[in-house]
């Protein structure tokens, strides 16, 4: 494992624990402090997703063993689920419309003027939009991961096809070599047989001449 990957993992774990602790403290905080805490947690959540992306890139670049790479990618998927369950959902539950009354419950409504109320509602709307953007980003990330996995599978399949084709070419080359050797052997035998045939014909002609010579002598 590369030193950069170890550093990313350490930063991820530290940021994750800090975000959990902030979410645990937020419900008991005054409204102004709570809003600040939630914004900070939102930033930490973005950092966590960024770290996962950076770790995924580093895994592809630094881990050559396919089995080890697959194991680490499974760990990244588990961490992504942890962010969803331990950070994103609790954060959303504190900022969505269903929890608005609880978020403002510790304030006396009669003491809040219109400007303050409008500011609170504006902050809530901003958090709501941020939550929607996070949902879209998560959906796009999942789709991208699926496309990337499919591309890797296609590349792996093409590599296997090329390997099989190369083996087939090696076998065909071996067969061609054997065929050439067989043809050379057959050619040598044909030449030898031709010389033998010429020799036999010459001997027969010689015998015929000897017979004729003996008769006319």
From Swiss-Prot:
Any one Gene Ontology BP term: vacuolar calcium ion homeostasis
Subcellular location: Prevacuolar compartment membrane; Golgi apparatus membrane
TM segment ranges: 195-215
Reported impact of residue 141 to S: In VTI1-12; blocks constitutively the traffic from the late Golgi to the vacuole and blocks the transport to the cis-Golgi compartment at nonpermissive temperature
Impact after mutating residue 151 to T: In VTI1-2; exhibits defects in TGN to PVC transport at nonpermissive temperature
Chain ranges on the Cytoplasmic side, renumbered to this chain: 2-194
Main location, first listed in the record: membrane
Modified residues (Phosphoserine): 110, 149
Annotated Pfam families: V-SNARE (PF05008), V-SNARE_C (PF12352)
Entries under InterPro entries matching the protein: GOSR2/Membrin/Bos1, SNARE, T_SNARE_dom, v-SNARE_N_sf, Vesicle_trsprt_v-SNARE_N
Family: Belongs to the VTI1 family.
Job description of the protein: t-SNARE found in various SNARE complexes involved in multiple transport pathways. The composition of the t-SNARE complexes is specific for a limited number of v-SNAREs and therefore allows only the vesicles carrying the matching v-SNARE to fuse.
Protein name as annotated: t-SNARE VTI1
Source organism of this protein record: Saccharomyces cerevisiae (strain ATCC 204508 / S288c) (Baker's yeast)
Lineage, opening ranks: Eukaryota, Fungi, Dikarya, Ascomycota, Saccharomycotina
Encoding gene, per UniProt annotation: VTI1
